[in-house]
């Protein structure tokens, strides 16, 4: 580290290396001596002209910081880069918290948490109380485990204890994502958070950097509009209001890829199709999830649908994000034709919690199926045929049934 003064400027030169990673900072700022002497004593303007280099890729930091005694700091900063990569930085952070005593402490903390969305306090209190803006313009940004995002643009506006991120946008695969984020009263015990946006025109295959994922296709569209408050992920989830919609088009998904979805996803997949483990691939025709949330209660009324080359699947029920309890009934229907009248899907339900999901028996489904079979015997099969026809009519187009107009989720999502 080198600091050298000259006139009203201080030149900074920093070079750091760790393993295969290197970090450098070079450039000039207003005299460090002047900053130390004048901060909160007299009006001060700090000019910043720095070049931050991470593994050979540079991020330019330009702008001014203003400090008037007894007033909040104000600033106007621009971050610009042709190509920057956060992969090693994020990986290094993960490694740092997975080593030695920190790892053991983190492990014990995780074991104690009974919620999928944990109760750890988010570091909102570390955000600065200030006035100003930060403009971000990065042509290509590398992130772990996915293709780089391109043309990243955003404007962050700070106003006391409120931060707005407006016109946040970037290219994703062959598509584009954009949205807005607002965080208010972040120094309080119940900060309020609102997010809205959408992403479209990309495929799952395009955004996965790992060719070993064995995924092809999967035209994807996402839209969301959510509001909540709280200082932890659990509080934010349990108080959430709004809507989320996701749709995925035709895709081929390796079983090994689906198994990375976590306990909840695996439990759903195994409940829908217990024989899937014998196949190394799922041929997806479409999947749609429309999830309205009211005070942390996710209601699913034929609003999650999946179609594969072999099955049509519909989900009904609720997920309570307050206690994270799951109460979902699964209705899978084979495409091979009529069954014997026993809707096996109606006998399956997802239960437990997001942290510890399990599949079980839908008692109401057992009774209904028994009644159907009994009536079928008495009517010579007419009741069974009627029940099958009804099931086919209501469950034969799960994706189309689940999908809502995109403009109902958030403006501009069409």
Q: What do these predicted regions represent?
A:
Residues 93-97:
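Terminal amphipathic helices with adjacent charged low-complexity linkers/tails
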Residues 246, 358, 366-367, 373:
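Extended amphipathic ligand-handling, pore-lining, and cofactor/metal-binding catalytic surfaces
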Residues 42-76, 206, 210-241:
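Repeat-solenoid scaffold signature
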Residues 369-389:
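Short hydrophobic membrane-inserting alpha-helices and related fusion/pore-forming segments
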Residues 1-24, 28, 49, 101-198, ...:
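Solvent-exposed beta-strand/coil patches in large extracellular/periplasmic or lumenal scaffold regions
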Residues 207-212, 331-364:
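Surface-exposed, gly/pro-biased binding rims or lids
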Residues 23-25, 86-90, 147, 204-208, ...:
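Outer-membrane beta-barrel proteins
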Residues 36, 122, 140, 208-212:
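Extracellular loop and loop/strand-boundary signature of outer-membrane beta-barrel proteins
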């Amino acid at each position: 580290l080198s600091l050298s003064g000259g006139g009203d400027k201080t030149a900074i030169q920093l070079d750091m290396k760790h393993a295969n990673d290197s970090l450098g900072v070079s450039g000039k700022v207003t005299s460090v001596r002047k900053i130390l002497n004048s901060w909160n004593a007299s009006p001060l303007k700090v000019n910043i002209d720095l070049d931050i280099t991470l593994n050979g890729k540079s991020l330019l930091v330009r702008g001014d910081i203003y400090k008037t005694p007894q007033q909040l700091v104000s600033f106007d900063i621009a971050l610009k880069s042709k190509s920057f990569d956060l992969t090693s930085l994020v990986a290094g952070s993960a490694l740092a918290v997975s080593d030695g005593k920190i790892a053991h402490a983190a492990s014990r903390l995780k074991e104690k948490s009974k919620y999928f969305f944990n109760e750890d306090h988010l570091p909102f209190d570390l955000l600065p109380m200030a006035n100003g803006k930060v403009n971000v313009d990065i042509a290509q940004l590398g992130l772990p485990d996915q293709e780089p995002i391109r043309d990243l643009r955003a404007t962050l506006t700070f106003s006391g204890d409120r931060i707005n991120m407006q016109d946040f946008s970037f290219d994703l695969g062959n598509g584009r994502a954009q949205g807005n984020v607002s965080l208010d009263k972040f120094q309080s015990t119940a900060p309020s958070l609102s997010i809205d946006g959408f992403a479209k025109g990309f495929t799952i295959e395009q955004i996965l950097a790992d060719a070993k994922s064995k995924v092809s296709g999967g035209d994807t569209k996402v839209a969301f509009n959510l509001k909540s408050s709280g200082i932890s992920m659990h509080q934010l989830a349990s108080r959430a209001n709004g809507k989320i919609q996701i749709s995925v088009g035709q895709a081929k998904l390796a079983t090994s890829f689906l198994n990375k979805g976590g306990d909840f996803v695996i439990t759903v997949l195994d409940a829908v199709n217990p024989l899937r483990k014998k196949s190394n691939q799922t041929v997806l025709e479409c999947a749609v999830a429309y999830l309205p949330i009211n005070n942390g209660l996710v209601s699913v009324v034929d609003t999650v649908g999946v179609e594969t080359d072999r099955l049509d699947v519909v989900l009904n029920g609720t997920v309570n994000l307050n206690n994270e309890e799951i109460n979902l009934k699964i209705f899978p229907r084979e495409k091979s034709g009529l069954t014997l009248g026993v809707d096996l899907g109606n006998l399956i339900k997802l239960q437990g919690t997001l942290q510890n999901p399990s599949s079980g028996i839908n008692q109401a489904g057992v009774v209904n199926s028994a009644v159907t079979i009994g009536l079928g015997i008495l009517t010579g099969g007419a009741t069974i045929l009627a029940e099958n026809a009804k099931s086919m009519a209501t469950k034969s187009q799960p994706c189309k049934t689940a999908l809502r107009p995109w403009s109902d989720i958030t403006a501009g999502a069409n």
